[in-house]
């Protein structure tokens, strides 16, 4: 891990590493530091946002399944607020190299596979910073929101905040099978994608 006072000119990029497992943070931060990255660590999404407030990183690598604010929520917030930051999502709960549905990231790293793949991904996504891609990122990311209970008729619902007019409205949850839900703002009719936060996500 980068030590205070080390020469900044040798750093390839400043990276924020987010995971709730201390062993993962230690192993990956050492790997990334040895390969020229300046690394800061956070143990969940809330701590990651605090680190971003201190200094915006060049890259983010985040676990998905974490207590507090999950990686699903964190990456959705990052994609909307800081769409120019390249992001790699990682998890042991999904296999293969395809992004899991609803994950706002540029690449996916499966935990436990060759860490050299992660280094290759970091090299690749640093070339994605174009204004056209930034616009596409911001438009495609779903909002991750918790359920708010049940209406008088017993139907589960969520409170959705429109990113265009910033007004809030209730939305009854239908029986769709996919992870991403679609609706239009009741006020300005802006199309909105959202996904549901489950409080009992496995660590």
Go through the PLM ranges and name each one.
Residues 19, 63:
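Active-site residues of response regulator receiver
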Residues 22-40:
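Two-component/phosphorelay signaling modules centered on CheY-like receiver
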Residues 43-47, 70-73:
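Acidic catalytic/metal-coordinating carboxylates
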Residues 55-61:
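Active-site beta3 strand of CheY-like receiver
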Residues 66:
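Receiver (REC) domain active-site loop signature in two-component systems and cognate sites
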Residues 73, 92-120, 130, 134:
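Alpha4 helix (beta4-alpha4-beta5 surface) of REC/receiver domains from two-component response regulators
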Residues 88-90:
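Hydrophobic/aromatic residues positioned on beta-strands within the core alpha/beta folds
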Residues 139-203:
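C-terminal output/effector regions of signal-responsive regulators
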């Amino acid at each position: 891990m980068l030590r205070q006072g080390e020469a900044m000119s040798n750093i390839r990029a400043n990276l924020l590493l987010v995971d709730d497992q201390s062993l993962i943070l230690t192993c990956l931060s050492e790997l990334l530091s040895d390969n020229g990255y300046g690394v800061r660590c956070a143990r969940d999404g809330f701590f990651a946002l605090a680190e971003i407030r201190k200094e915006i990183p060049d890259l983010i690598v985040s676990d998905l399944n974490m207590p507090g604010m999950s990686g699903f929520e964190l990456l959705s917030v990052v994609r909307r607020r800081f769409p120019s930051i390249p992001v790699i999502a990682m998890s042991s709960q999904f296999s293969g190299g395809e992004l899991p549905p609803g994950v706002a990231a540029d690449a996916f790293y499966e935990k436990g596979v060759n860490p050299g793949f992660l280094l290759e991904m970091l090299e690749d996504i640093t070339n994605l910073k174009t204004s056209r891609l930034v616009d596409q990122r911001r438009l495609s990311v779903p909002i991750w929101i918790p359920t708010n209970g049940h209406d008088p008729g017993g139907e589960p619902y969520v409170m959705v905040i429109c990113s265009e007019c910033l007004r809030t409205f209730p939305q009854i949850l239908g029986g769709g099978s996919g992870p991403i839900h679609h609706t239009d703002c009741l006020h300005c009719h802006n199309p909105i994608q959202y996904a549901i936060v489950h409080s009992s996500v496995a660590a």
